[in-house]
Amino acid sequence: MKLSRRQFLQRSTLAGVATVTPTSLWAKNRPSLTIPPMIEVGRGRPVRLDFRPAQTQFNKGKLVDVWGVNGRYLAPTVRVKSGDFVKLTYTNNLPQALSINIQGLQAPTEMIGSIHRAIDKNSSWSPILSVNQSACTAWYHADTMLNSAFQVYRGLAGLWIIEDSESRKASLPNKYGVNDIPLILQDQLINSDGIQVIDTQTNQFFGKRLFVNGQESPYFDVPRGWVRLRIANASLSRHYDLRLDNGKPLYLIATGIGFLADMVEMEHISLAPSERIEVLVDLNEGDKVSLITGKKRDFFDEIGKLFKDNNELNDNVVLEFRPEGLPSALNVTPKLPPFNVEEFNLKITQERKINLRPQDRLINHQRFDPKRIDFTVKKGTVERWYLTTTEEVGFTLQGAKFMVETRNRQAVPHKQLAWRDCVWLEPTQETTLLVKFEHTASEQQPFTFGVSDLMLRDRGCMGQFVVAE
């Protein structure tokens, strides 16, 4: 690679600095990945989720107060089968009111929660959920009006895994915590005492350190073969651009609400705040490899961070895989569940234009008003939404699902068809969605839509809609 004189001088300066910089600055003594405990839901079995203070270590040796569920930082994974009833009990033992949302669960607001269903401190709420949908990876998190970002940042986030009869029969990695790995991504600012720092009065939040399941850029000892990653972006504002640092592909198999027709080979995958994806990685051969966000960094990139004051992460490694055992001669490619393409032959009943101005916290020139219903739709209908934005941002909605039809007037490839509830938007593109409404929401408990950035959402960049019978 040919360097300009300016680049040569910059790198010479950095090289000089490197000789006097402690090795510990770039040495990576990674912690082991923590796997959230699993709550396996049997038919009618009660599930108790106690939201209360907990403790963890962000800086080694410094135990600090955080929030969590059932006594741990972050929340346990809840796994349920489609067709089951779930008797939930949420108990709020935190010092402030709390609302909960299960993003990705397709059900009425009376079941999944809403910003208008607050659980006061020292109180409980016990909904009964009827789970009837295709397999997916959802996440549950604080959704408290004007306060969701702070509460999620403190630790109120976890996964729901919904399975159906077809997903259980598919030849996919399914040993939870072994080759079926949950990854909850959060970027954080941690002070010298090991305490979380956040200014909730800013429009957006970008931390300097990346934590996965509560551990900073960890490693994971994994058996050779195919590995399944269930990745949830629980960061408040940060968007991730995921890839492997050895240049090998990721294989996308599912988005937030369902599977694709077949695994799609991708060099990198975008992940908006609140978005979930499932990907496969082939680790049958080779040495350790890392899942990273952004481009692979070299020595000079690492040292150069000392001179930059921006939103870049100190370490862009999401997870380092350390394969164990011998390669298998029978490393069979996994097969996905059957795909019903007829689900996507949709009859459009109405079209709607939605323009986002995130930094002004406006949608169609209006800021959020908890007393205003922005529109009403009929259950069972499908609408085409035309989305535009003045800045790059994630878009999401509650209680309904959509497929991405076009980006910048170009049809999305058939192989990428899948149901979603979150999508990343670019300011230079118009994105069209086909939105399907299958569950009701009343005026007292409406569904919400808007940006998926929780900071901007708390500051008013969202709206409400009703789904009537």
From Swiss-Prot:
NCBIfam families: TAT_signal_seq. One of its GO terms (cellular component) is outer membrane-bounded periplasmic space. Residues 1-27 form the signal peptide. This is Cell division protein FtsP. Predicted to be exported by the Tat system. The position of the signal peptide cleavage has not been experimentally proven. Keywords: Cell cycle, Cell division, Periplasm, Signal. It is found in: Periplasm. Its main location: periplasm. The lineage of its organism: Bacteria, Pseudomonadati, Pseudomonadota, Gammaproteobacteria, Pasteurellales.
